[in-house]
C-alpha cells in the first residue's frame, strides 16, 4: 500500500489538510506517474480541465514518470492537452516510455524538459488477440491504424519526417535526455529549477 503524505495548512478558518498531490494541483502541477490506464487518465483529464477553468492563461506543469500503458487512455490525455487553452509544460522525471514519451513530446513547444538522468523510450504499439481468423484480421488492421496515428503525432511534435519516425519506432528505442533532445522529443535538459524560464520571462538578478 502506497502512503501518500498529507500537508496541513493554516487558513483563516483553521487547519486544512491536503494529500500532497492535491496540494501541488493548487500550484498547477500535475503528476503522470505509473502505468497509464483509464482511471488514471480520467483523473489527469479532470485536473487539466479544472486548472483551465481556474485560469485559462496560466501554464500547467506536467511531471511524467511512466512506463506507458493503454493507448486510448494516453490519447485521452494527449487530446485534452491540445484542447485546453493553457500551455502545458512537460518534465520527465525517472522515465517516459511508450505513451509516456508521447505525452512528454506533446507539451508546448519550447517547454518540454527532462532531468539529466531520466530515460526515454519510443516504440510501436503492441497487442494480441485470439479468436476467429476474421476477427484477428480486424484487430490487426486496427493496431496498424493506431500505429500510423501515433507516428503522425510524433511527426507533428518532433519535426522529423514520417519515414524517420517509422524507422525509429520499429523496435524499442531507449534514449538518454540529450539523445531525446536531438530528435525533438524534448527542448532542453535541465539540472536545476533555475534552468527553466517560467512563462518565457527571463529574470536576471544582478548584484551591485
Curated annotation (Swiss-Prot):
InterPro entries: ClpP (IPR001907), ClpP/crotonase-like_dom_sf (IPR029045), ClpP/TepA (IPR023562), ClpP_His_AS (IPR033135), ClpP_Ser_AS (IPR018215). GO terms for biological process: protein quality control for misfolded or incompletely synthesized proteins. NCBIfam families: clpP (TIGR00493), PRK00277.1 (NF001368), PRK12553.1 (NF009205). Pfam families: CLP_protease (PF00574). GO terms for molecular function: ATP-dependent peptidase activity; ATPase binding; serine-type endopeptidase activity. PROSITE patterns: CLP_PROTEASE_HIS, CLP_PROTEASE_SER. Belongs to the peptidase S14 family. It is found in: Cytoplasm. The gene is clpP. It is an enzyme of class 3 (hydrolase). One of its GO terms (cellular component) is endopeptidase Clp complex. It catalyses: Hydrolysis of proteins to small peptides in the presence of ATP and magnesium. alpha-casein is the usual test substrate. In the absence of ATP, only oligopeptides shorter than five residues are hydrolyzed (such as succinyl-Leu-Tyr-|-NHMec, and Leu-Tyr-Leu-|-Tyr-Trp, in which cleavage of the -Tyr-|-Leu- and -Tyr-|-Trp bonds also occurs). The active site is at residues 98, 123. Its EC number is 3.4.21.92. Fourteen ClpP subunits assemble into 2 heptameric rings which stack back to back to give a disk-like structure with a central cavity, resembling the structure of eukaryotic proteasomes. Keywords: Cytoplasm, Hydrolase, Protease, Serine protease. It comes from Wolbachia pipientis wMel. Cleaves peptides in various proteins in a process that requires ATP hydrolysis. Has a chymotrypsin-like activity. Plays a major role in the degradation of misfolded proteins. CDD domains: S14_ClpP_2. This is ATP-dependent Clp protease proteolytic subunit.
Amino acid at each position: 500500500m502506497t502512503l501518500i503524505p498529507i500537508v496541513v495548512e493554516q487558513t483563516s478558518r483553521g487547519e486544512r489538510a491536503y494529500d500532497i498531490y492535491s496540494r501541488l494541483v493548487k500550484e498547477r502541477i500535475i503528476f503522470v506517474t505509473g502505468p497509464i490506464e483509464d482511471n488514471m487518465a480520467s483523473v489527469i483529464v479532470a485536473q487539466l480541465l479544472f486548472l483551465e477553468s481556474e485560469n485559462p492563461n496560466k501554464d500547467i506543469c506536467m511531471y511524467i514518470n511512466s512506463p506507458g500503458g493503454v493507448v486510448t487512455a494516453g490519447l485521452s490525455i494527449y487530446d485534452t492537452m491540445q484542447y485546453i487553452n493553457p500551455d502545458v509544460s512537460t518534465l520527465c522525471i525517472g522515465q517516459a516510455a511508450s505513451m509516456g514519451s508521447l505525452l512528454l513530446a506533446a507539451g508546448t513547444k519550447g517547454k518540454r524538459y527532462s532531468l539529466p538522468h531520466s530515460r526515454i523510450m519510443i516504440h510501436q504499439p503492441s497487442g494480441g488477440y485470439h479468436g476467429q481468423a476474421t476477427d484477428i484480421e480486424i484487430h490487426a488492421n486496427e493496431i496498424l491504424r493506431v500505429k500510423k496515428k501515433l507516428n503522425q503525432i510524433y511527426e507533428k511534435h518532433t519535426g522529423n519526417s514520417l519515414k524517420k519516425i517509422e524507422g525509429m519506432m520499429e523496435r524499442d528505442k531507449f534514449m538518454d535526455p540529450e539523445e531525446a533532445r536531438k530528435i525533438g522529443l524534448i527542448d532542453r535538459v535541465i539540472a536545476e529549477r533555475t534552468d527553466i524560464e517560467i512563462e518565457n520571462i527571463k529574470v536576471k538578478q544582478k548584484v551591485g
